[in-house]
Every structure is written in structure tokens, then in C-alpha cells.
């Protein structure tokens, strides 16, 4: 299984706060509720490619 690097971007301010190792076999983008240091609160973060 191949692994690639991907970033998690805040949906509110757009900053890329987290980097993850994601499988290339997955077709849907990952969505997690994480803390954004720029917004100062927990927001939805989506995987960017």
C-alpha cells in the first residue's frame, strides 16, 4: 500500500495546521475536528492534496 503526505487545512481560515501520512487507495478526503491555533478554537479540518 502506497503512502503519501497530505495536509489538513482549517475550513474557517484556510491555514494548513497538520500533516498526515495518507493512503493513496482512499478516495474520500479526510475530515476531522481539530484545534486551529490561528482561530483559537476547534474547527473542521479537511485533507488537502
From Swiss-Prot:
The keyword GTP-binding does not apply. Keywords: Ribonucleoprotein, Ribosomal protein. GO terms for molecular function: structural constituent of ribosome. Belongs to the bacterial ribosomal protein bL33 family. One of its GO terms (biological process) is translation. SUPFAM superfamilies: Zn-binding ribosomal proteins (SSF57829). GO terms for cellular component: cytoplasm; ribonucleoprotein complex; ribosome. The gene is rpmG1. Signal peptide: none annotated. Gene3D superfamilies: Ribosomal protein L33 (2.20.28.120). This is Large ribosomal subunit protein bL33A. The keyword Ribosomal protein applies. It comes from Lactobacillus gasseri (strain ATCC 33323 / DSM 20243 / BCRC 14619 / CIP 102991 / JCM 1131 / KCTC 3163 / NCIMB 11718 / NCTC 13722 / AM63). Pfam families: Ribosomal_L33.
Amino acid at each position: 500500500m502506497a503512502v503519501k503526505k497530505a495536509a489538513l487545512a482549517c475550513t474557517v481560515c484556510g491555514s494548513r495546521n497538520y500533516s498526515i501520512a495518507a493512503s493513496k487507495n482512499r478516495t474520500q478526503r479526510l475530515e476531522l475536528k481539530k484545534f486551529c491555533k490561528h482561530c483559537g478554537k476547534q474547527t473542521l479540518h479537511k485533507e488537502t492534496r
